[in-house]
Curated annotation (Swiss-Prot):
Gene Ontology biological process terms, A to Z: thiamine diphosphate biosynthetic process
InterPro entries associated with the record: Aldolase_TIM, Thiazole_synthase_ThiG, ThiG
Broad enzyme group: transferase
GO terms for MF: thiazole synthase activity
Protein name as it appears in the record: Thiazole synthase
């Protein structure tokens, strides 16, 4: 994959990535569309729901790793579908076995099936256990700055606050909480859930997020591969805008042309 690595590259758990767009692998019509969309996104980290996706646990079924090989992508197993800390920890341990000792994992412990909001009590409990077990934990959480800091202090490798409910496409609903999380953090902050279109991804990056993870926004689009390409450009543009620094907002106009030396 031709992904430019610069001094501004994303670093997670000691590994450097040229792309700040992380993608999911669910909801695509088939494995070929998954492959094409992942390539169009330029993603280097792809997340996989261990309880829903075959990565070797079912030998007779199509294997996602045949189209997204671990030699090319960092596979990020996640605990989607888990509602208790115990289930999440068990799922991570299974993933580590299937991926030959791979320790990077995405933790999510959900509160209920309607909202898919994280159960923060169970999330904290699972995060503490997984860190003790030697996992590098990227954790899905609410946009609560206090909780985000606590997860960082536990030892999580990245904190992943939601922008809006999973799959909602509502975009960033509370940018001020995200800003506080970003300002206080010493680990990467990656927006996870709620992105609907390219402008949402760009806004997240303009705020100073280190990356964006998405699945439904790409897989649910009319043309997923084209949307993946759009998201790639949005993340890159948003990051460059953040680094460049936006102009201050003003209530009144400010002429862009100099007034000195006017003719007449």
């Amino acid at each position: 994959m031709n992904v430019h690595v610069s001094p501004d590259s994303l670093v997670i758990a000691g590994k450097t990535y040229g792309s700040r767009l992380l993608t999911g692998t669910g909801k695509f019509k088939d494995l070929e569309e998954t492959r094409l969309a992942t390539e169009a996104a330029g993603a280097q980290i792809v997340t996989v729901a261990i309880r829903r996706t075959n990565i070797g646990q079912n030998p007779g079924e199509p294997n996602l790793l045949d189209v997204l090989p671990p030699e090319r992508y960092t596979i990020l197993p996640n605990t989607a579908g888990c509602y208790t800390a115990e289930d999440a920890v068990r799922t991570c341990r299974l993933a580590r076995e299937l991926l030959d000792g791979h320790n990077l994992t995405k933790l999510e412990v959900l509160g209920d099936q309607k909202s898919l909001y994280p159960d923060v009590v169970q999330t904290l409990k699972a995060a503490e256990q997984l860190v003790k077990d030697g996992f590098e934990v990227m954790v899905y959480t609410s946009d609560d700055p206090i909780l985000a800091k606590r997860l960082e202090e536990i030892g999580c490798a990245a904190v992943m606050p939601l922008a809006a409910p999973i799959g909602s496409g509502l975009g960033i609903q509370n940018k001020y909480n995200l800003l506080q999380i970003i300002e206080d953090a010493k680990v990467p902050i990656i927006v996870d859930a709620g992105v609907g279109t390219a402008s949402d991804a760009a806004i997240a990056m303009e705020l100073g997020c280190d990356g964006v993870l998405m699945n439904t926004a790409i897989a649910g689009a009319r043309h997923p591969v084209l949307m993946a390409s759009a998201m790639r450009k949005a993340v890159e543009a948003g990051r460059e805008a953040f680094l460049a620094g936006r102009i201050p907002r003003k209530r009144y106009a400010s002429a862009s042309s100099p007034v000195d030396g006017l003719i007449g």
